[in-house]
Amino acid sequence: MSDAETLTLALSKGRILDDTLPLLADCGIRLTEDPERSRKLIFETTVPGVRVIVVRATDVPPFVEHGGADLGVAGKDVLMEYGSNGLYEPLDLNIARCRMMVAGHPGANERPGRLRVATKFVNIARRYYAEQGRQVELIKLYGSMELAPLVGLGDVIVDLVDTGNTLRANGLEPLEHITDISSRLVVNKASMKMKHRRIKALLGQLAEAVEARRA
């Protein structure tokens, strides 16, 4: 099958990949190699003309938007943080579910004056506090968010919370719920026009697989 007819799906390693592969399998699409045991970045599948590329989670939207992939699976947190105006977002896959939260020591979010917020989600945090009319100082971090309140780097953090075990282990707790997060299927706008029939068919299969898992 020619490249013009091939569907390329961008996934990121980790929880999204682990949760997406069973959904694809429900649609009859399986990788021909185990991505966890391979250094390859492009994987063929059992369906001719459908392949998977593995990229960083934050790179899924630009790969899809600029034509490196026809479709992708990205967390709503990534789409909110980095923008998704150039993408179609037709389906909530209902996987990799968690919550975007403000967290910190009890009562830390009620302190008067400018709040110091440590996060890697600076755009989400900025919009959230702007809607509240609250003055904040945003401190960009790339990991170990829970450490910030412990060493006085920030009053609170804005981060993804799943079980909350890491927060509790460090004497922190969820303070404010910003939004629920799950992974979404995103589609390149040009691909949706040029490969409409194939993409529409895959969308239908995935929607059925998602619904079946909800039942």
Curated annotation (Swiss-Prot):
Which class of enzymes does this protein belong to?
Answer: transferase
Keyword match Nucleotide-binding: yes
Which InterPro entries does the record associate with it?
ATP_PRibTrfase_cat, ATP_PRibTrfase_CS, ATP_PRibTrfase_HisG, ATP_PRibTrfase_HisG_short
Keywords, A to Z, come to: Amino-acid biosynthesis, ATP-binding, Cytoplasm, Glycosyltransferase, Histidine biosynthesis, Nucleotide-binding, Transferase
Catalyzed reactions per annotation: 1-(5-phospho-beta-D-ribosyl)-ATP + diphosphate = 5-phospho-alpha-D-ribose 1-diphosphate + ATP
Q: Name one GO molecular function term.
A: ATP binding
Q: Which family does it belong to?
A: Belongs to the ATP phosphoribosyltransferase family. Short subfamily.
Domain description: Lacks the C-terminal regulatory region which is replaced by HisZ.
Subunit structure as annotated in this protein's UniProt entry: Heteromultimer composed of HisG and HisZ subunits.
Give the protein's recorded name. Answer: ATP phosphoribosyltransferase
Which organism does this sequence originate in?
Alkalilimnicola ehrlichii (strain ATCC BAA-1101 / DSM 17681 / MLHE-1)
What broad taxonomic lineage does this protein's source fall under? Bacteria, Pseudomonadati, Pseudomonadota, Gammaproteobacteria, Chromatiales
Its gene is hisG
